[in-house]
Amino acid sequence: MSGARPLTVVVVDDSLTTRALIAAALRRDPRVKIVGTAGTPFEARDLIVRLNPDVLTLDFEMPSMNGLQFLEKIMRLRPMPVVMVSGHLSSHRGLVEQSLRMGAAEWYSKTTTANGEDPFAGLGDAIVRAAAMKQQAPVPVATDSANRTVPKIGTVVGIGASTGGVEALTDVLGHFPVACPPTVIVQHMPRQFSESFARRLDRIVKPEVRLAEEGDMLKPGTVYVASGGERHLRVRCGARSGEYVCQLVAAPPVNGHRPSVDELFYSLATTVGKNAVGVILTGMECDGAQGLLAMRHAGASTIGQDRASSVIYGMPRAAYELGAVETQLPLSAIGPAILNLCERRSLETYP
Protein backbone atom coordinates (compact mmCIF):
# COMPACT_ATOMS: atom_id res chain seq x y z
CA MET A 1 0.00 0.00 0.00
CA SER A 2 2.95 2.31 -0.54
CA GLY A 3 1.69 5.84 -1.15
CA ALA A 4 -1.95 4.86 -0.59
CA ARG A 5 -4.21 6.55 1.92
CA PRO A 6 -4.49 4.53 5.16
CA LEU A 7 -7.79 2.76 5.67
CA THR A 8 -9.93 4.58 8.22
CA VAL A 9 -11.31 2.34 10.96
CA VAL A 10 -13.88 2.64 13.73
CA VAL A 11 -13.40 0.14 16.57
CA VAL A 12 -16.48 -1.06 18.48
CA ASP A 13 -15.93 -3.02 21.69
CA ASP A 14 -17.57 -2.70 25.10
CA SER A 15 -14.22 -3.28 26.86
CA LEU A 16 -12.11 -0.15 27.32
CA THR A 17 -9.04 -2.38 27.75
CA THR A 18 -9.69 -4.20 24.49
CA ARG A 19 -10.21 -0.93 22.64
CA ALA A 20 -6.87 0.29 23.97
CA LEU A 21 -5.11 -2.94 22.92
CA ILE A 22 -6.60 -2.76 19.42
CA ALA A 23 -5.60 0.88 19.11
CA ALA A 24 -2.04 0.10 20.20
CA ALA A 25 -1.75 -2.73 17.67
CA LEU A 26 -3.19 -0.74 14.78
CA ARG A 27 -1.06 2.32 15.48
CA ARG A 28 1.92 0.17 14.49
CA ASP A 29 0.34 -0.64 11.11
CA PRO A 30 0.77 2.16 8.53
CA ARG A 31 -1.99 0.68 6.36
CA VAL A 32 -4.73 1.62 8.80
CA LYS A 33 -5.78 4.63 10.86
CA ILE A 34 -8.25 4.54 13.75
CA VAL A 35 -10.58 7.52 13.46
CA GLY A 36 -12.91 6.59 16.31
CA THR A 37 -13.71 4.07 19.04
CA ALA A 38 -17.05 3.21 20.61
CA GLY A 39 -18.13 1.20 23.63
CA THR A 40 -21.72 0.62 22.49
CA PRO A 41 -23.53 0.19 19.16
CA PHE A 42 -25.31 3.48 19.83
CA GLU A 43 -22.02 5.37 20.07
CA ALA A 44 -20.83 3.50 16.98
CA ARG A 45 -23.93 4.53 15.04
CA ASP A 46 -23.10 8.21 15.51
CA LEU A 47 -19.44 7.71 14.59
CA ILE A 48 -20.34 5.82 11.41
CA VAL A 49 -22.68 8.57 10.26
CA ARG A 50 -20.21 11.34 11.12
CA LEU A 51 -16.89 9.76 10.07
CA ASN A 52 -17.87 7.37 7.24
CA PRO A 53 -15.02 4.92 7.97
CA ASP A 54 -13.63 2.46 5.43
CA VAL A 55 -13.88 -0.51 7.82
CA LEU A 56 -15.61 -1.31 11.11
CA THR A 57 -14.30 -3.77 13.69
CA LEU A 58 -17.21 -5.08 15.74
CA ASP A 59 -17.11 -7.03 19.00
CA PHE A 60 -19.53 -9.94 18.86
CA GLU A 61 -20.33 -10.00 22.59
CA MET A 62 -21.75 -6.67 23.77
CA PRO A 63 -24.51 -5.69 26.19
CA SER A 64 -27.77 -4.08 25.01
CA MET A 65 -27.36 -5.26 21.41
CA ASN A 66 -25.11 -8.11 20.26
CA GLY A 67 -22.80 -7.84 17.29
CA LEU A 68 -25.09 -9.77 14.94
CA GLN A 69 -28.01 -7.47 15.66
CA PHE A 70 -25.90 -4.40 14.97
CA LEU A 71 -24.37 -6.03 11.89
CA GLU A 72 -27.85 -6.59 10.49
CA LYS A 73 -28.65 -2.90 10.89
CA ILE A 74 -25.38 -1.75 9.36
CA MET A 75 -25.62 -4.05 6.34
CA ARG A 76 -29.19 -3.02 5.66
CA LEU A 77 -28.76 0.71 6.09
CA ARG A 78 -25.10 1.52 5.40
CA PRO A 79 -23.24 -1.47 3.90
CA MET A 80 -19.52 -1.41 4.65
CA PRO A 81 -16.66 -3.86 5.33
CA VAL A 82 -17.03 -5.26 8.86
CA VAL A 83 -14.56 -7.42 10.78
CA MET A 84 -16.30 -9.35 13.55
CA VAL A 85 -14.08 -9.82 16.61
CA SER A 86 -14.61 -12.57 19.19
CA GLY A 87 -12.69 -14.19 22.01
CA HIS A 88 -14.38 -17.58 21.53
CA LEU A 89 -14.30 -18.19 17.80
CA SER A 90 -14.33 -22.00 18.07
CA SER A 91 -17.65 -22.00 19.93
CA HIS A 92 -19.31 -19.62 17.47
CA ARG A 93 -19.02 -21.59 14.23
CA GLY A 94 -22.73 -21.36 13.46
CA LEU A 95 -22.77 -17.65 14.21
CA VAL A 96 -19.68 -17.13 12.06
CA GLU A 97 -21.49 -18.63 9.06
CA GLN A 98 -24.61 -16.60 9.82
CA SER A 99 -22.67 -13.33 10.06
CA LEU A 100 -20.87 -14.01 6.77
CA ARG A 101 -24.23 -14.59 5.09
CA MET A 102 -25.39 -11.29 6.58
CA GLY A 103 -22.49 -9.46 4.98
CA ALA A 104 -19.54 -9.54 7.42
CA ALA A 105 -16.23 -9.61 5.56
CA GLU A 106 -14.02 -11.28 8.21
CA TRP A 107 -14.00 -12.90 11.64
CA TYR A 108 -11.00 -12.35 13.90
CA SER A 109 -10.18 -14.21 17.11
CA LYS A 110 -8.83 -12.08 19.94
CA THR A 111 -7.80 -15.08 22.07
CA THR A 112 -4.41 -14.55 23.72
CA THR A 113 -1.75 -16.91 22.40
CA ALA A 114 0.20 -19.30 24.63
CA ASN A 115 3.52 -17.56 23.98
CA GLY A 116 2.10 -14.17 24.99
CA GLU A 117 2.02 -12.66 21.49
CA ASP A 118 -0.21 -9.66 20.87
CA PRO A 119 -3.69 -11.09 20.19
CA PHE A 120 -4.36 -8.24 17.76
CA ALA A 121 -1.11 -8.46 15.78
CA GLY A 122 -2.98 -9.85 12.77
CA LEU A 123 -5.99 -7.54 12.94
CA GLY A 124 -4.48 -5.10 10.45
CA ASP A 125 -4.25 -7.90 7.87
CA ALA A 126 -7.91 -8.78 8.48
CA ILE A 127 -8.91 -5.14 8.02
CA VAL A 128 -7.01 -4.87 4.73
CA ARG A 129 -8.61 -8.10 3.46
CA ALA A 130 -12.05 -6.86 4.48
CA ALA A 131 -11.56 -3.55 2.68
CA ALA A 132 -10.48 -5.36 -0.48
CA MET A 133 -13.65 -7.44 -0.61
CA LYS A 134 -16.49 -6.19 -2.80
CA GLN A 135 -19.45 -5.44 -0.57
CA GLN A 136 -22.43 -7.55 -1.55
CA ALA A 137 -26.00 -7.38 -0.41
CA PRO A 138 -26.45 -9.70 2.58
CA VAL A 139 -28.64 -12.76 2.38
CA PRO A 140 -31.87 -11.95 4.23
CA VAL A 141 -32.00 -13.48 7.69
CA ALA A 142 -35.37 -14.17 9.29
CA THR A 143 -35.91 -12.10 12.44
CA ASP A 144 -38.78 -10.96 14.59
CA SER A 145 -38.74 -7.66 12.71
CA ALA A 146 -40.61 -9.39 9.87
CA ASN A 147 -43.72 -9.14 12.01
CA ARG A 148 -43.37 -5.46 12.83
CA THR A 149 -45.48 -2.78 11.21
CA VAL A 150 -42.94 0.04 11.12
CA PRO A 151 -42.77 1.23 7.48
CA LYS A 152 -40.26 -0.66 5.35
CA ILE A 153 -39.12 2.46 3.51
CA GLY A 154 -37.74 4.16 6.63
CA THR A 155 -37.83 7.94 6.81
CA VAL A 156 -40.18 10.09 4.70
CA VAL A 157 -39.22 13.68 3.89
CA GLY A 158 -41.85 16.40 3.48
CA ILE A 159 -40.94 19.83 2.08
CA GLY A 160 -43.06 22.96 1.74
CA ALA A 161 -42.18 26.13 -0.16
CA SER A 162 -43.68 29.18 -1.86
CA THR A 163 -42.03 32.36 -3.21
CA GLY A 164 -38.42 31.55 -4.08
CA GLY A 165 -39.07 27.86 -3.61
CA VAL A 166 -38.29 26.80 -7.17
CA GLU A 167 -34.64 27.76 -6.76
CA ALA A 168 -34.52 26.60 -3.14
CA LEU A 169 -35.87 23.15 -4.00
CA THR A 170 -33.38 22.84 -6.83
CA ASP A 171 -30.58 23.48 -4.34
CA VAL A 172 -31.92 21.06 -1.70
CA LEU A 173 -32.64 18.21 -4.12
CA GLY A 174 -29.29 18.79 -5.80
CA HIS A 175 -27.68 17.22 -2.73
CA PHE A 176 -29.85 14.09 -2.87
CA PRO A 177 -28.36 10.82 -4.18
CA VAL A 178 -30.18 8.51 -6.59
CA ALA A 179 -31.39 6.37 -3.68
CA CYS A 180 -32.72 9.28 -1.64
CA PRO A 181 -35.43 8.93 1.01
CA PRO A 182 -38.97 9.13 -0.44
CA THR A 183 -39.79 12.84 -0.56
CA VAL A 184 -43.11 14.66 -0.96
CA ILE A 185 -43.24 18.35 -1.88
CA VAL A 186 -45.83 21.11 -1.90
CA GLN A 187 -44.64 24.16 -3.85
CA HIS A 188 -47.19 26.93 -4.26
CA MET A 189 -47.63 27.49 -8.01
CA PRO A 190 -50.39 27.48 -10.63
CA ARG A 191 -51.41 24.11 -11.99
CA GLN A 192 -50.14 24.85 -15.51
CA PHE A 193 -46.57 25.22 -14.22
CA SER A 194 -46.46 22.13 -11.96
CA GLU A 195 -45.74 19.58 -14.67
CA SER A 196 -42.95 21.59 -16.30
CA PHE A 197 -41.45 22.24 -12.85
CA ALA A 198 -41.37 18.52 -12.04
CA ARG A 199 -39.88 17.71 -15.46
CA ARG A 200 -37.19 20.34 -15.01
CA LEU A 201 -36.22 18.99 -11.60
CA ASP A 202 -36.18 15.45 -12.98
CA ARG A 203 -33.64 16.49 -15.61
CA ILE A 204 -31.21 18.20 -13.26
CA VAL A 205 -31.23 16.16 -10.03
CA LYS A 206 -30.27 12.53 -9.45
CA PRO A 207 -33.52 11.07 -8.02
CA GLU A 208 -36.65 10.59 -10.12
CA VAL A 209 -39.01 13.57 -9.79
CA ARG A 210 -42.66 13.21 -10.78
CA LEU A 211 -46.07 14.73 -10.13
CA ALA A 212 -47.84 12.91 -7.31
CA GLU A 213 -50.82 10.83 -8.40
CA GLU A 214 -53.56 9.21 -6.33
CA GLY A 215 -52.34 5.93 -4.89
CA ASP A 216 -48.65 6.40 -5.73
CA MET A 217 -46.68 4.21 -3.33
CA LEU A 218 -43.82 6.13 -1.73
CA LYS A 219 -40.50 4.53 -2.52
CA PRO A 220 -36.84 5.48 -2.07
CA GLY A 221 -35.26 7.31 -4.97
CA THR A 222 -38.44 9.18 -5.89
CA VAL A 223 -39.59 12.75 -5.25
CA TYR A 224 -43.34 13.42 -5.49
CA VAL A 225 -44.46 16.98 -6.32
CA ALA A 226 -48.03 18.14 -5.67
CA SER A 227 -49.85 19.49 -8.71
CA GLY A 228 -51.09 23.04 -8.17
CA GLY A 229 -54.65 24.25 -8.05
CA GLU A 230 -57.19 21.47 -7.58
CA ARG A 231 -56.34 19.03 -4.79
CA HIS A 232 -54.34 18.79 -1.58
CA LEU A 233 -51.56 16.23 -1.28
CA ARG A 234 -51.61 14.02 1.79
CA VAL A 235 -49.74 10.86 2.77
CA ARG A 236 -51.71 7.91 4.12
CA CYS A 237 -51.02 4.29 5.00
CA GLY A 238 -51.22 1.84 2.11
CA ALA A 239 -53.32 -1.29 1.83
CA ARG A 240 -50.41 -3.44 3.03
CA SER A 241 -48.56 -3.03 6.29
CA GLY A 242 -45.48 -0.86 6.09
CA GLU A 243 -46.46 1.15 3.02
CA TYR A 244 -47.26 4.82 2.49
CA VAL A 245 -49.13 6.21 -0.50
CA CYS A 246 -50.07 9.60 -1.92
CA GLN A 247 -53.64 10.77 -1.43
CA LEU A 248 -55.09 13.62 -3.49
CA VAL A 249 -57.99 15.33 -1.74
CA ALA A 250 -60.50 17.73 -3.32
CA ALA A 251 -61.11 20.01 -0.32
CA PRO A 252 -61.31 23.79 0.14
CA PRO A 253 -58.07 25.81 0.18
CA VAL A 254 -56.20 26.00 3.49
CA ASN A 255 -54.42 29.27 4.36
CA GLY A 256 -55.52 30.42 0.91
CA HIS A 257 -53.65 27.59 -0.83
CA ARG A 258 -54.51 24.33 -2.55
CA PRO A 259 -52.40 22.29 -2.27
CA SER A 260 -51.49 23.45 1.23
CA VAL A 261 -48.22 22.75 3.02
CA ASP A 262 -50.17 22.42 6.27
CA GLU A 263 -52.31 19.63 4.78
CA LEU A 264 -49.20 17.68 3.78
CA PHE A 265 -47.46 18.20 7.12
CA TYR A 266 -50.53 17.27 9.17
CA SER A 267 -50.81 14.01 7.25
CA LEU A 268 -47.14 13.22 7.84
CA ALA A 269 -47.51 13.94 11.55
CA THR A 270 -50.49 11.60 11.79
CA THR A 271 -49.33 8.82 9.48
CA VAL A 272 -45.53 8.79 9.60
CA GLY A 273 -44.87 10.41 13.00
CA LYS A 274 -41.31 10.20 14.26
CA ASN A 275 -40.12 8.56 11.04
CA ALA A 276 -40.57 11.83 9.13
CA VAL A 277 -38.43 14.88 8.46
CA GLY A 278 -40.29 18.14 7.80
CA VAL A 279 -38.70 21.09 6.01
CA ILE A 280 -40.15 24.56 5.46
CA LEU A 281 -38.49 26.79 2.89
CA THR A 282 -38.79 30.36 1.66
CA GLY A 283 -42.28 31.78 1.13
CA MET A 284 -44.69 34.47 2.27
CA GLU A 285 -47.34 34.25 4.98
CA CYS A 286 -47.69 31.21 7.25
CA ASP A 287 -48.76 28.08 5.35
CA GLY A 288 -47.02 25.04 6.86
CA ALA A 289 -46.24 26.49 10.28
CA GLN A 290 -49.00 24.70 12.20
CA GLY A 291 -48.46 21.45 10.32
CA LEU A 292 -44.73 21.54 11.00
CA LEU A 293 -45.49 22.06 14.69
CA ALA A 294 -47.72 18.97 14.59
CA MET A 295 -44.86 17.03 13.02
CA ARG A 296 -42.46 18.13 15.74
CA HIS A 297 -44.95 17.16 18.44
CA ALA A 298 -45.25 13.74 16.76
CA GLY A 299 -41.49 13.23 17.12
CA ALA A 300 -40.38 14.18 13.62
CA SER A 301 -37.23 16.20 12.94
CA THR A 302 -37.98 19.67 11.56
CA ILE A 303 -35.87 22.18 9.64
CA GLY A 304 -36.54 25.79 8.67
CA GLN A 305 -34.67 27.96 6.18
CA ASP A 306 -32.96 30.94 7.79
CA ARG A 307 -33.74 34.59 7.13
CA ALA A 308 -30.52 35.42 5.27
CA SER A 309 -30.97 32.77 2.58
CA SER A 310 -34.76 33.12 2.16
CA VAL A 311 -36.25 35.16 -0.68
CA ILE A 312 -39.26 35.78 1.58
CA TYR A 313 -38.80 34.96 5.27
CA GLY A 314 -42.50 34.46 5.90
CA MET A 315 -43.35 30.77 6.15
CA PRO A 316 -40.05 29.86 7.85
CA ARG A 317 -40.42 32.75 10.27
CA ALA A 318 -44.00 31.82 11.21
CA ALA A 319 -42.90 28.24 11.86
CA TYR A 320 -39.84 29.34 13.85
CA GLU A 321 -41.79 31.76 16.05
CA LEU A 322 -44.38 29.06 16.68
CA GLY A 323 -41.70 26.68 17.97
CA ALA A 324 -42.13 24.29 15.05
CA VAL A 325 -38.54 24.53 13.81
CA GLU A 326 -36.05 22.29 15.56
CA THR A 327 -33.10 23.46 13.46
CA GLN A 328 -32.78 26.66 11.40
CA LEU A 329 -30.22 26.51 8.59
CA PRO A 330 -29.01 28.40 5.51
CA LEU A 331 -30.27 26.95 2.25
CA SER A 332 -26.92 25.42 1.30
CA ALA A 333 -26.89 23.30 4.47
CA ILE A 334 -30.45 21.97 4.31
CA GLY A 335 -29.95 19.17 1.76
CA PRO A 336 -27.00 17.60 3.62
CA ALA A 337 -28.84 18.04 6.94
CA ILE A 338 -31.88 16.15 5.64
CA LEU A 339 -29.73 13.23 4.52
CA ASN A 340 -27.85 13.17 7.83
CA LEU A 341 -31.11 13.11 9.80
CA CYS A 342 -32.48 10.30 7.65
CA GLU A 343 -29.34 8.23 8.15
CA ARG A 344 -29.45 8.74 11.91
CA ARG A 345 -33.14 7.88 12.15
CA SER A 346 -32.66 4.79 10.00
CA LEU A 347 -29.81 3.56 12.20
CA GLU A 348 -31.96 4.15 15.29
CA THR A 349 -34.92 2.10 14.02
CA TYR A 350 -35.42 -1.46 12.88
CA PRO A 351 -37.63 -1.57 9.81
Swiss-Prot record:
User: What is this protein called in UniProt?
Assistant: Protein-glutamate methylesterase/protein-glutamine glutaminase
| Keyword Phosphoprotein on entry | yes
Q: What is known of its domains?
A: Contains a C-terminal catalytic domain, and an N-terminal region which modulates catalytic activity.
For this protein, the record's InterPro entries field holds: CheB-like, CheB_C, CheY-like_superfamily, Sig_transdc_resp-reg_Me-estase, Sig_transdc_resp-reg_receiver
* GO terms under biological process: chemotaxis
Task: Tell me which residues bear 4-aspartylphosphate.
Answer: D59
Domain of life per record: Bacteria
The species is Gluconobacter oxydans (strain 621H)
Reactions catalysed: [protein]-L-glutamate 5-O-methyl ester + H2O = L-glutamyl-[protein] + methanol + H(+); L-glutaminyl-[protein] + H2O = L-glutamyl-[protein] + NH4(+)
Q: Which UniProt keywords apply?
A: Chemotaxis, Cytoplasm, Hydrolase, Phosphoprotein
* CheB-type methylesterase domain mapped to chain residues: 151-345
Q: How is it modified after translation?
A: Phosphorylated by CheA. Phosphorylation of the N-terminal regulatory domain activates the methylesterase activity.
Domain Response regulatory per the UniProt entry, residue ranges? 8-125
Q: Where is this protein found?
A: Cytoplasm
Gene name for this UniProt entry = cheB
Instruction: Please give the Gene Ontology molecular function terms for this protein.
Output: phosphorelay response regulator activity; protein-glutamate methylesterase activity; protein-glutamine glutaminase activity
